Swiss-Prot record:
This is Protein Daple. It is found in: Cytoplasm; Cell junction. Residues 1011-1024, 1589-1604, 1842-1855 have a biased composition (Polar residues). One of its GO terms (molecular function) is dynein light intermediate chain binding. One of its GO terms (biological process) is positive regulation of JNK cascade. Residues 2026-2028 are annotated as: DVL1-binding. Residues 1419-1428, 1689-1704, 1879-1897 have a biased composition (Basic and acidic residues). Residues 11-131 form the Calponin-homology (CH) domain. Homooligomer. Interacts with DVL1 (via PDZ domain); dissociates following initiation of non-canonical Wnt signaling. Interacts (via C-terminus) with ligand-activated Wnt receptor FZD7; competes with DVL1 for binding to FZD7 and displaces DVL1 from ligand-activated FZD7. Interacts (via GBA motif) with guanine nucleotide-binding protein G(i) alpha subunits GNAI1, GNAI2 and GNAI3 (inactive GDP-bound form); interacts with higher affinity with GNAI1 and GNAI3 than with GNAI2 and interaction leads to G(i) alpha subunit activation. Does not interact with GNAO1. The lineage of its organism: Eukaryota, Metazoa, Chordata, Craniata, Vertebrata. A motif (PDZ-binding) lies at residues 2025-2028. GO terms for cellular component: apical junction complex; cell junction; centrosome; cytoplasm; extracellular region. It comes from Homo sapiens (Human). Residues 247-428, 456-1017, 1045-1094, 1139-1393 form a coiled coil. Keywords: Cell junction, Coiled coil, Cytoplasm, Disease variant, Guanine-nucleotide releasing factor, Neurodegeneration, Phosphoprotein, Spinocerebellar ataxia, Wnt signaling pathway.
Length: 2028
């Protein structure tokens, strides 16, 4: 059979209609084979039987029960069925079948087609309609209800198709209705019209069909006309077959044989039926005979009964007369006794009534309590559900937020990386241009004539090289993108594996829960059955009680009647007594004699009657025994039948289960195949990655070609022809590059396809898991069903036993009662003699006692049953509650499982993201290492090139070649490592595959065990053994994955180093290209001269051309003629070939037809032979069959004869047995009569004695009865009292319960009020922070000093020759200022020591205890800290004061010696000393008390906790000094991850300013904690690396830290918009380099990279500063060219602001690369951009640059740029990611982009010398700080609680904006609303337009802006930075608003940066880094307490207040900013 047919069969047999049919009984001969079941349906036998059940009316047609795949019989059965259905609908249901009737022919002929299945569905549908509307419909509907819900729904839909759809079945009952609504009539008429139309169409079609068929018949007859001769002969001859052909004869013979076989069958059936008829008649005759016998017996028994009654009546009358006197006396006494009993019963009734009333009351009370308790329980459940839902929603939102943050981080980081790369290349190109110009000028001055053609070529070649390098870089970036895509693919594969494991675990949990649920359900069912049984028993007892009461009432009435009767008898006796005693005595004697005679006669009769009675009893007992045996046999039969049925069901269920298991196995195999295909697709994707590597190789080849081009350039210097060739080759290269780009696009498309494949793979794996779960659930279900079956069987057997026992007992009781009644009657009759009275007395007494006992028992039972019923009621209630709870728990469980799956998925995605980011960071670090090494080489070569310009350009090209070779080697090594990684991943996947296969095998084994064992236990144990191994394997896989990631990250970092190198090369090539273009122009002039000569030659050639044209015309004519001839010949040849082909085709067709004909003839002959063979076979079989039939008939007759003989013998045997039994009975009767007479005589004598004894006993028992009665009444009264007391106690308990609930509610309200008071306390403690603002005035003074210092430096810089001397003096001054600043800071810290900490309060915040611990140690003197700093590593430094002279000496020595090249090494050593802990694990990260640097050590993992713990230290570190900020940047975000930052401080010029800006924000944030602030200030100032070194940067940093901005209270800061806090970040960013110098290396950076130690990459500066010097004018010109202009701020009058604005324009673009700072921040030393820039800060390597040292503008990155430095940089906190980089470019204006900064800085230097003195200090300051702000903005992207947030991207765009806006605000002395500065960069919008929220919040920003304007540079910086800074510090910001730890600063929360990862992610609420105050406030960080809202207003007020208050003091900052400029200039 076809596969599709089997599928159709399965679908059909699983349809609801077939499942309904199965309820009528198993079909398919009990087997579960789909085909046999289906054929059984198609044959129509089973369906006809169903129809017979529905419609039992007799039908004339017989069904063929043995179809044997006979089409005709099948059709016959189906037609009978359809006819029956049709008649039933019309006659019984009054309905008309309108739908097309099932096509019986189609079903009969081709039952296995899809159409025939549809027709059978029609049949089943019509049968269903009959069943649902027939008389037995309730029974059928009950069966339907027992089916599954899904099948029920399907059956209901089918029923509606029949009953409701008038198009299928039309209801005719409306005809009988008298009134029909017009709407219904209208609908009916419409449907009728439609049916009419359809019938007419069908009639027309049928007529057409008839016409066609008749035409066909006529045609066929015409084709074979019967010849007249043959016909006549046929008529005449008796054999008409003679005219037929041999084939027709054979056919007819076969048909004849078939009809004979049928005839035989029919005859056989007839014979069977006749035999059955004879048998039944015989049985009827026997039954008639038996009936007659029974009737006769019945008549005889009736006659006997009548005679017995007559005798009894006579006897009774005689006995009554004789014994009346004695009986009356006895009755009197008995009545008296019964009277006492009546009283007792009345009392008992009253007691029972009272008990009932009490019970009803208690029941009502308990029900009330129950309802109340249930209501409470329901409320609790609802609240729990709501709570869980809210928690899940919260969790989902948090997950979404985290993912958004991560995504934003990644995007921003990428953005920054790209911008940094762009700026680097621009810087390099500008620098090269500047060098070339300088060299050209020098050459012109020395000797203009010496300028040679070779030099120009050199320049052109260098420019061209630069261009090629740029192109190379773009290609590298595309390759990197493709690599990232391949990494994503691999990660998705890992995700799939993890999801599969988690799914397995969840499925196991679900299975366990299901088993528990099933157990609980079973227990519930057991309890329900028990309760039902108890209820039934209770009802029975109640009915027994009622019957007893009725009996008692009857007895009382009888007794009263007897009493009346006795009274009358007494009166008559008294009257008689008055008559003379003599007469009386005589009468008595006469009566006695007469009585004696009558007694003797009666005794004789009695003995006879007793004998007869005994005989009857025996007969009865025998009959009863027989009846019991028959009943037992019947029961056993029923039981066996039930067991058979049950076993059959079990077998069917097991078979279905096995089929399902097999189907599931097939499905799982299919899924495995799909799995393999998906794995193959993964392999193809890996091949794609290999292709990518091939592209990289092509790229290397291009590099090699570039080298060749350079060589060609050397050779082509003197020839123009060679130049032209070069250009052509260049064009070819460009084309190749375009092709490569196209290839890259194709690869991207392939990557997308791979992603789609991954998605499909995930869906397939999910389906696989679902199927596995369904398999497991099905196996569990089968087990549970088996267990339930076993339990049900046991219960059923127990119930059956109980039932049988009850029936037996019942039968015995009934028989006993009957016997007892009969015996009592007989005894009464016999005792009507003299002894009757005694016997009656005895019997009555016994009855009384029995009834008393029964009554007592029944009352006891009743009470026990009542108690039990109460207990059961309670249990029932409990069970119901439990069931309700169970359902709720199930729902909760489902919800939880869903949540668990969601959480698991999110967790896996988060894990994978983490892994990705770690990989990226490691790759970046490795790339940075490589780049640093290569740059060292390249840098040295550059120096040689610059120094040896005259020696020629050969060396340059050699250097380039060497560099390219090294790059090739590095890329090869990277590829090898990647291949290793891919192989490892392949192995992991293979292991996963093996695990899956092993699990599948285990599942198969479990299925097999299921089939074998029906028990439950073993299978479950096996199924739970496997997950452990899996989990272990997965853990090992995860552990093994870590190192691989690190290697990959190293490789990526190397690649990126290579990319930067290539960019530089491209820049050089571009310069060379420009030179070549100039040479081209020169050559073109020469070409002009040659062209004049060519004109003369052209004239000569014109004459020749004319002659040539004539010749060409002639040749053309000849060619035309030739072509025409050739075309004609071609056409002829084509025609010829066509004809040939046609001919061959015809021949082949002819041959094929001949072959077919031969095949057909052969087949026909074979068929004829088969036919003949079949005919012979048929004849032989028919003969054998007839012989067998004869034998069978003979045997049947024999069998009948034997049966008759057997019956006759049986009858004779029975007669003989009856006679024998009668004789035996007669003998027994005689013997028994004799014995009975003797016994009667004995019993009469005994009875008299017993009577007297019993009377005595009766008296005694009566006395005891009275006593017991009294005791019982007393006990009853006592029980009543106890019951009432119990009820009272319960009521009191309820009252107390209510009281308890009230108290509980009060307690809750008290708790709420307590929390409110705590919040209030927090607010009060916040207010205390405002007192700390006064301390900032000292800081502003220090800033003024630093500004003056800068001015002096600028003046000194004007004279180049005296530069070195001035530099030394300047360093001394700086050191002095630093010492002065240290002293001032110590004084300030001493002042702070005397501040009291804010009042303690009950802190619900987790980190409160940690804060307390941290705050305490800070109160110790700064001197202790000084001692510990020198010896301790950075972590210890944190807790000690690092200002000790020993630590600072090395720095000073370095500062004094500006020319020494060992500077870098010293710095590196210092960093080793302080940063030795970089390698420490997270364990070292715990912040120590009072540690200023603590944030730098924090790790991402601990970020949230540290955010809380680190407040105290953060306060100090931020407020005190730049060094603190640089070292403890992570305070703001527990993990310092601004690599860029460390680098940012490559030049001193910037150091000072950044520190100023940065400190201010810090100050603000931490003002609120005076004690911690003071101590932290001490520690941070002393511990700052700058301070230790004694460099001027430290001094400036400190001076700024006390700027007027510090006066802003921490509250203000918390609420300030980003404008307010960003500057701080900026500042920090600039100063970040100091950190590496001395402060602990930010651990995070080191740990993340896990690579080079701090000193790696440190490179000595060029030996001679003079060689690096450049004139200021030249540098300014260069920078002006490179830096694009940008929008000027509103205050245009300020020149310095203009300069800074110009400088800051580029940064807006470039500043973004905050995070890239990790990678490239190090690469961007400012020395690139500003030749005069001083590298005072330990450039990222941590190398301190001396203040006066010149750094030569250089392509190579200083070691600071090397990857090792990256780690320190990262550590340098979060002040702002973007800052880090900007700071690298020390040019103050461009806080973000180093290049732009340097350019703007150079401009600032030149102008500062002239304008700064006259420029208003504040304005300059304002202009300066804003520019720095840009970088800090980067911090904006981080929320308080988010660990891994860096917002490099925003800073870039916002830095500019921010820089501008503050200027405007300051110029106007009022903020103009949220300027671009405060505006967050919405990464989604990528525009500076303020978002809607920010537009709504101008008020907050305007309030803060004025403060910023007046506050000086720090304040200005704050204007743009407050948000970002706050965000950045949000963990610390919380401390800033110290009094309220729960609600960290709202405004700043918007974007806190935790540099955990390279990827940036903006938190949801705070996602837009620069959002204004209004936006920031509502945003809640995870760690924030919910009481944020109340403080929003206050925070805003504080903002405005702080700004106003701060405006009053003259801000030292205005001067400070120019000072910073001066300082920068001096450094340069």
């Amino acid at each position: 059979m076809d596969v599709t047919v089997s599928e159709l069969l399965e679908l059909f047999l699983q349809s609801p209609l077939v499942t309904w049919v199965k309820t009528f009984g198993p079909f398919g001969s009990g087997s579960q084979d789909n085909l046999t079941m289906y054929m059984d349906l198609v044959d129509g036998i089973f369906l006809n039987q169903i129809m017979l059940q529905i419609d039992p009316r007799p039908t004339n047609q017989r069904i063929n029960k043995h179809v044997n795949n006979d089409v005709n019989l099948r059709i016959q059965n189906l037609t009978i069925l359809v006819r029956n259905i049709k008649t039933y609908y019309q006659e019984v249901l009054q309905q008309l079948i309108v739908m097309n009737l099932p096509n019986v022919l189609m079903i009969g002929r081709d039952p296995l087609s899809g159409k025939s299945m549809e027709e059978i569905k029609k049949v089943l549908l019509l049968v269903l309609g009959c069943a649902v509307q027939c008389e037995r419909k309730e029974e059928f509907i009950e069966r339907i209800k027992q089916l599954d819900i899904e099948t029920q729904a399907g059956i209901v839909a089918h029923i509606q198709e029949v009953t409701h759809n008038q198009e299928n079945v039309f209801d005719l009952q409306w005809l009988e209705l008298p009134d029909v609504a017009p709407e219904e009539l209208e609908a009916l008429s419409r449907s009728m019209v439609l049916h009419l139309r359809r019938l007419i169409d069908q009639r027309d079609e049928c007529t057409e069909l008839i016409v066609d068929l008749t035409q066909e018949r006529d045609y066929l007859q015409a084709q074979h006309p019967p010849s007249p001769i043959k016909s006549s002969s046929a008529d005449s001859t008796p054999s008409p077959t003679s005219s037929l052909s041999s084939e027709d004869k054979q056919h007819l013979a076969v048909e004849l044989a078939d009809t004979k076989a049928r005839l035989r069958r029919v005859r056989q059936e007839l014979e069977d039926k006749t035999e059955q008829l004879v048998d039944t008649r015989h049985e009827v005759d026997q039954l008639v005979l038996e009936l007659q016998k029974v009737k006769q017996e019945n008549i005889q028994l009736a006659a006997d009964a009548r005679s017995a009654r007559a005798y009894r009546d006579e006897l009774d009358s005689l006995r009554e007369k004789a014994n009346r006197v004695e009986r009356l006396e006895l009755e009197l006494t008995r009545c008296k006794e019964k009277l006492h009993d009546v009283d007792f019963y009345k009392a008992r009734m009253e007691e029972l009534r009272e008990d009932n009333i009490i019970l009803i009351e208690t029941k009502a009370m308990l029900e009330e309590q129950l309802t109340a308790a249930r209501a409470r329980g329901d409320k609790v459940h609802e609240l729990e559900k709501e709570n869980l839902q809210l928690k899940s929603k919260l969790h989902d939102l948090e997950l979404d937020r985290d993912t958004d943050k991560k995504r934003i981080e990644e995007l921003l980081e990428e953005n920054m990386v790209l911008e940094i790369a762009q700026k680097q290349s621009m810087n390099e190109s500008a620098h090269l241009g500047w060098e070339l110009e300088q060299l050209s000028k020098n050459a012109d001055l020395s000797d203009a004539s010496r300028k040679s053609f070779v030099f120009e070529l050199n320049e052109c070649a260098s420019s061209r090289i630069l261009k090629l390098e740029k192109e190379n870089q773009s290609l590298q970036s595309t390759i990197q993108g493709l690599r990232d895509a391949s990494l994503v693919l691999e990660e998705s594969g890992l995700k799939c594996g993890e999801l599969e494991k988690e799914n397995h675990q969840l499925s196991k949990k679900i299975e366990k829960l299901q088993t528990q649920l099933e157990r609980e359900k079973q227990s519930n069912q057991d309890l329900e059955t028990l309760s039902e049984e108890l209820i039934r028993e209770k009802e029975q007892l109640q009915s027994d009680m009622e019957t007893l009461k009725a009996d008692k009432a009857r007895q009382i009435k009888d007794l009263e009647q007897e009493k009346d009767h006795l009274n009358r008898a007494m009166w008559s006796l008294r009257e008689r007594s008055q008559v003379s005693s003599e007469a009386r005595m005589k009468d008595v004697e006469k009566e006695n004699k007469a009585l004696h005679q009558t007694v003797t006669e009666a005794n004789g009769k009695l003995s006879q009657l007793e004998f007869e009675k005994r005989q009857l009893h025996r007969d009865l007992e025998q009959a009863k025994e027989k009846g019991e045996r028959a009943e037992k046999l019947e029961r056993e039969l029923q039981r066996l039948q039930e067991e058979n049925g049950r076993l059959a069901r079990k077998v069917t269920s097991l078979e279905t289960a096995t089929e399902k298991v097999e189907a599931l196995e097939h499905e799982s195999q299919g899924l495995q195949l799909e799995n393999r295909t998906l794995r193959k697709s993964l392999d193809t994707l890996q091949n794609v990655s290999l292709q990518l590597e091939g592209l990289e190789r092509d790229n290397k080849q291009l590099d090699a070609e570039n080298l060749e081009l350079r060589r060609l350039v050397e050779t082509m210097r003197f020839t123009s022809t060679k130049l032209a060739q070069m250009e052509r080759e260049n064009q070819q290269l460009e084309r190749e590059k375009e092709e490569l780009r196209k290839n890259v696009d194709l690869l991207k498309a392939l990557g997308k396809k791979s992603e789609r494949l991954e998605l499909s793979y995930q869906s397939v794996s999910a389906e696989n898991l679902r199927l596995q779960q369904s398999l497991e659930s099905s196996s569990h279900k089968t087990q549970t069903l088996e267990s339930e079956l076993g339990e049900l069987e046991a219960e059923r057997q127990a119930l059956r036993r109980d039932l049988e026992a009850l029936r037996l007992a019942n039968a015995q009781l009934e028989g006993a009662e009957k016997d007892r009644k009969a015996l009592e009657q007989e005894v009464a009759q016999l005792e009507k003699d003299k002894k009757l009275l005694e016997k009656e007395a005895k019997r009555l007494w016994q009855q009384v006692e029995l009834k008393d006992a029964v009554l007592d028992d029944s009352t006891a039972k009743l009470s026990a049953v009542e108690k039990e019923s109460r207990a059961l009621d309670k249990e029932l209630a409990r069970c119901r509650d439990a069931a309700g709870k169970l359902k709720e728990l199930e729902k909760d469980n489902r919800d939880l499982t869903k949540q668990v799956t969601v959480h698991a998925r999110t967790l896996t995605t988060l894990r994978e993201d983490l892994v990705l980011e770690k990989l990226k960071s490691q790759q970046l670090s490795s790339e940075l290492d490589k780049l640093s090494q290569e740059l060292e080489k390249v840098g040295l070569n550059r120096e040689l090139l610059l120094q040896e310009d005259d020696s020629g350009s050969d060396t340059k090209y050699k250097i380039l070649e060497g560099r390219n070779e090294s790059a090739l080697k590095t890329t090869l090594a990277m590829k090898e490592e990647k291949i290793v990684l891919l192989e490892a991943q392949m192995e992991e996947k293979a292991s996963l595959n093996r695990q899956l296969e092993s699990e599948l095998q285990m599942l198969k084994k479990e299925c097999e065990t299921l089939r074998q064992n029906q028990g439950e236990g073993q299978h479950l144990q096996n199924s739970f053994k496997h997950p452990a191994g899996k989990t272990a394997a997965s853990h090992q896989g995860k552990e093994a994955w870590g190192p691989g990631h690190k290697e990959a990250t190293m490789e990526l970092l190397r690649v990126k180093d290579r990319a930067i190198e290539l960019e530089r090369n491209n820049a050089a090539l571009q310069a060379e290209k420009q030179l070549l273009k100039e040479q081209l122009q020169h050559l073109e002039t020469q070409n002009v001269t040659f062209s004049s000569q060519i004109l003369t030659l052209q004239k000569q050639s014109a004459f020749l051309q004319e002659h040539n044209t004539t010749l060409q015309t002639q040749t053309a004519k000849l060619q035309v003629e030739n072509s025409t001839l050739s075309s004609q010949s071609a056409a002829l040849t084509a025609q010829y070939t066509l004809l040939q082909n046609h001919h061959t085709a015809k021949e082949t067709e002819n041959e094929s037809l001949q072959r077919q004909q031969e095949q057909l003839t052969a087949a026909y002959e074979a068929l004829l032979q088969d036919h003949e063979h079949l005919g012979t076979l048929h004849e032989r079989q028919s003969a054998e069959y007839e012989a067998l039939i004869r034998q069978h008939s003979c045997l049947k007759t024999l069998h009948r004869n034997l049966e008759l003989e057997h019956k006759e013998l049986g009858e004779r045997h029975g007669d003989m047995l009856k006679r024998k039994a009668e004789l035996e009975e007669r003998e027994k009767v005689l013997t028994t009569e004799r014995e009975a007479l003797q016994q009667e005589q004995r019993t009469n004598a005994l009875a008299m004695g017993e009577n007297q004894r019993l009377r005595g006993e009766l008296d005694r028992v009566n006395f005891l009865h009275h006593q017991l009665k009294g005791e019982y009444e007393e006990l009853h009264a006592h029980t009543k009292e106890l019951k009432t007391s119990l009820n009272n106690a319960q009521l009191e308990l309820n009252r107390w319960q209510a009281r308890f609930d009230e108290l509980k509610e009060q307690h809750q309200t008290m708790d709420i009020s307590l929390t409110k008071l705590d919040n209030h306390c927090e607010l009060l403690s916040r207010l205390k922070g405002n007192l700390e603002e006064e301390n900032h005035h000292l800081l502003s003074q220090i800033q003024l000093l630093s500004q003056q210092n800068q001015m002096l430096l600028e003046q000194n810089m004007e004279n180049k020759e005296q530069y070195h001397e001035e530099q030394k003096q300047y360093i001394d001054k700086l050191n002095a200022l630093r010492r002065h600043k240290e002293k001032l800071e110590e004084k300030i810290m001493d002042q702070y020591k005397f501040y009291d900490p804010p009042p303690k309060k009950k802190n619900h915040w987790i980190g409160a205890k940690a804060l307390v611990k941290l705050i305490k140690p800070k109160k110790e003197g700064s001197r202790e800290r000084l001692k510990s700093t020198v010896d301790s590593p950075p972590w210890q430094l944190e807790s000690s004061d690092p200002a000790s002279p020993a630590a600072s000496q090395p720095l000073r020595s370095q500062a004094e010696n500006p020319d020494t090249p060992a500077l870098g090494s010293n710095c590196a050593e210092e960093r080793d000393a302080h940063n030795g802990s970089v390698g420490k694990g997270p364990g070292d990260l715990k912040p120590k008390r009072g540690s200023p640097h603590r944030g730098s050590l924090d790790r991402t993992d601990a970020s949230t906790d540290l955010a809380m713990r680190s407040w105290p230290s953060e306060l100090g570190s931020r407020t005190c000094s730049t060094s603190a900020t640089t070292t403890a940047p992570s305070n703001s975000t527990p993990i310092a991850r601004h690599p860029g930052r460390t680098k940012g401080y490559n030049s001193d010029d910037n150091l000072c300013e950044p520190s100023l800006e940065f400190e201010v924000p810090n100050h603000r944030q931490y003002v609120s904690r005076p004690s911690s602030l003071e101590s932290s200030r001490n520690t941070s100032s002393n511990s700052s690396p700058l301070n230790l070194k004694g460099s001027s940067e430290q001094l400036h940093g400190r001076s700024e830290s006390f700027s007027s901005e510090d006066l802003i209270p921490s509250r203000d800061l918390a609420t300030l918009p980003r404008e307010a806090s960003t500057p701080g970040r900026n500042a920090l960013g600039r100063h970040e380099y100091p950190l590496p110098r001395n402060g602990p290396l930010p651990q995070e950076g080191a740990q993340k990279r896990g690579t080079a130690p701090p000193y790696v990459g440190v490179r000595p500066c060029s030996a001679s500063p003079s060689s690096e010097m450049v004139t200021l004018e030249e540098f300014l010109e260069e920078s002006n060219r490179s830096s694009p202009t940008h929008d000027t701020p509103s205050c245009r009058d300020d020149l310095l602001s203009d300069y800074f604005r110009k400088a800051s324009d580029p940064p807006a673009i470039g500043g973004q690369p905050g995070p890239p700072a990790k990678k490239e921040g190090a690469k961007m030393p400012t020395n690139f951009v500003a030749p005069t820039v001083k590298m005072a800060a330990p450039t990222s390597e941590g190398r301190p640059l001396k203040p006066g040292q010149y750094v030569k503008p250089n392509f190579r990155l200083t070691e600071a740029e090397a990857p090792p430095s990256v780690a320190p940089r990262q550590a340098q906190p979060p002040q702002s990611l973007s800052l880090g980089r900007p700071r690298q470019a020390p040019v103050p204006p461009a806080s973000h982009a180093p290049a732009s900064r340097s350019a703007s800085l150079s401009r600032a230097f030149s102008l500062a010398s002239a304008d700064l003195l006259r420029a208003s200090g504040p304005e300059a300051c304002k202009q300066e700080s804003p520019q720095k702000l840009g970088a800090p903005e980067a911090l904006g992207g981080r929320e308080t609680g988010s660990h891994t947030l860096q917002s490099p991207a925003p800073p870039s765009s916002h830095s500019l904006a921010r820089e501008r806006t503050p200027l405007v605000g300051k110029a106007g002395s009022s903020c103009q609303g949220p300027g671009p500065r405060s505006r967050p960069l919405d990464t989604r919008r990528f525009s500076l337009a303020p978002p809607k929220e920010e537009r709504l919040a101008p008020l907050h920003q305007s309030a803060t802006a004025p403060a910023i304007a007046t506050a000086g540079a720090g304040a200005a910086a704050a204007g743009s930075g407050s948000n970002s800074q706050l965000l950045h510090f949000s963990p610390a910001a919380a401390p800033a608003a110290r009094t309220k730890p729960k609600a960290p600063p709202r405004s700043g929360e918007v974007a806190t940066i935790t540099p955990v990862r390279a990827g940036l992610s903006l938190s949801e609420g705070d996602g837009v880094p620069g959002q204004g105050c209004s936006e920031g406030l509502p945003a809640k960080s995870p760690g924030r307490s919910p009481d944020l809202a109340p403080h929003l207003g206050r925070a805003l007020e504080d903002c405005s207040r702080g700004s106003v208050s701060k405006s009053s003091p003259a801000s030292p900052e205005p001067g400070g900013d120019p000072q910073t400029v001066w300082y920068e200039y001096g450094c340069v």
